[in-house]
Amino acid sequence: MRRLLFVAATVLAVAPAASGATTSPCALVTADDAGKALGVKVGTGKAQTLGLYKACTYAKGRKTLTVLVRQIDKKTFEKSAKKNPPPVFPIPGIGDEAFSAGGGSALLVWKKGTEVTFTFIGVSPVVQTQKDVANAALKRL
């Protein structure tokens, strides 16, 4: 029994402290963030699971921003990102690695084992707008 308590105490002592970070897509991208990216005020995001991803969708009229989040290693992320609709090209200055896909309709970002994908429908935000929403989300990751 003492040995078990010692092991438990040791594990607790070396375990990292919990941080305020999240992988909830509706927490990573707020309604304010989504509204700025879409150019319209949006309500609360709709959280759901889409296949391997946790998702959050913000919509107003025909404008939609969907945020997809999953845990993934870098090599698999790169391979997956390059399979998106062309053109697919790297975007510097976001996370550890990022790609634009589908003529700017999607931004795929990888940081420390987490993929965050942003898909835009009904709006064609400039790259800087995409970077702004991505960097805001990554600060919360």
What does each model-found stretch correspond to?
Residues 4-18:
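Sec-dependent N-terminal signal peptides
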